[in-house]
Curated annotation (Swiss-Prot):
Lineage, uppermost ranks: Bacteria, Pseudomonadati, Campylobacterota, Epsilonproteobacteria, Campylobacterales
Molecular function in Gene Ontology: S-adenosylmethionine:tRNA ribosyltransferase-isomerase activity
Keyword annotations of the record: Cytoplasm, Queuosine biosynthesis, S-adenosyl-L-methionine, Transferase
PANTHER family for the chain: S-ADENOSYLMETHIONINE:TRNA RIBOSYLTRANSFERASE-ISOMERASE
EC numbers on record: 2.4.99.17
Localization: Cytoplasm
Family: Belongs to the QueA family.
Protein name per the record: S-adenosylmethionine:tRNA ribosyltransferase-isomerase
């Protein structure tokens, strides 16, 4: 069936529609609204986004905070040039970290960030990932110290389709105004559309709750299995406080700010009797595993053959998704992380 064929999720996007910078002020970004019941499409801007939110819905937001996850170092402490890139993914046990390192590397190699701070390669894992530990003068660093090191020397992890180096504006703009709990290596991009003013109006006028899904590097990975049902999606750390769990369990209608919030809601609501607040979220939503609990979605326009495009198709159907994306292309909407948005009602 074509809805499970990977090639069905391909489309051509003119390069000039890939957003390399955010629209400022945020309210000026374009917004496509699709109402499923009437099949009506409205073109507006984020200045009016809250006017379209159903009044009695629960709005769910992901308050993860992006780490400055890209580090540059050298293999020798005395070398001034920093040409080896370390992309931090997540912490593992005993303060070790899962990373990607560009270039040839072997177990035991050290990568220096200054005269004292360095990382040592502990293990070469499958799929190109590297297990490393961080040190200060041979003393292992704990997680808090590693995060300080990343904040001091790291760069914002802009997506691979943004073909430029990160700039000072990205520290502010590639982070939602409600980002709180550090741990993501990619922004939950629908959240980037909210200015402080829009957020305050949302919190004042709508029922809402927060959860934390630390977006992983796997969010950019394309699906590669010919049958999308065979794809193994990445795992991400999810934290839902007890108060938020109670609100989610009671709510009938849910509007998710972004695919990360939606995946979190779907994962949590399918658990029988969750007793903890921390989870490993690995839910892959597509037409064979459709959305059951979330009712509405605010999202950006996603990459061809991506799991996020399949999630949107699970909500409105493959043909309607392709039709709307073609309209967005014709109307010169800006795509991907810094791009325009779409509200599915």
């Amino acid at each position: 069936m074509k809805e499970f064929d990977l090639e069905s999720y391909d489309y051509h996007l003119p390069k000039e529609l890939i957003a390399n910078y955010p629209i400022l002020p945020k309210e000026k970004a374009k917004l496509l609204i699709y109402e499923r019941h009437s099949q009506k499409i409205t073109h507006t801007t984020f200045e009016h986004v809250l006017d379209f939110f159903p009044k009695n819905t629960l709005v769910v937001l992901n308050d993860t905070k992006v780490i400055k996850a890209r580090l540059f170092g050298s293999k020798y402490a005395f070398l001034p040039s920093k040409t080896t890139e370390v992309f931090f993914h997540r912490f593992l046990k005993n303060n070790t970290a899962l990373t990607q390192i560009k270039g040839k590397i072997k177990v035991g190699d050290k990568i220096f960030f200054d005269e004292n701070h360095y990382a040592e390669v502990l293990e070469l894992l499958n799929n190109g990932q590297r297990l490393i530990a961080f040190y200060d003068n041979k003393t292992p660093l704990d997680q808090a110290s590693i995060l300080k090191l990343l904040e001091q020397y790291g760069h914002m992890p802009l997506p691979p389709y943004i073909k430029r180096a990160d700039e000072s504006l990205d520290t502010l703009e590639y982070q939602s105004v409600f980002a709180k709990h550090i741990g993501a290596v990619a922004a939950p991009t629908a959240s980037l559309h909210f200015s402080q003013n829009t957020l305050e109006n949302l919190l004042k006028d709508f029922k809402h709750t927060f959860l934390t899904l630390h977006v992983g590097a796997g969010t950019f990975a394309s699906v590669e299995t010919k049958d999308i049902r065979e794809h193994q999606i990445h795992t991400e750390v999810l934290h839902i406080p007890k108060k938020s769990q109670e609100i989610l369990q009671k709510s009938q209608e849910i509007l998710c700010i972004g695919t990360t919030a939606l995946r979190s809601v779907e994962y949590f609501k399918r658990l029988k009797t969750p007793k903890q607040e921390a989870f490993e979220c690995d839910i892959f939503l597509h037409l064979a595993n459709p959305i059951q609990h979330a009712n509405y979605l605010l999202t950006n326009f996603h990459l061809p053959k991506s799991s996020l495009l399949m999630l949107v198709s699970a909500m409105i159907g493959l043909e309607k998704t392709k039709e709307i994306y073609q309209i967005a292309i014709e109307k010169k909407y800006r795509f991907y992380s810094y791009g325009d948005g779409m509200l599915i009602l």
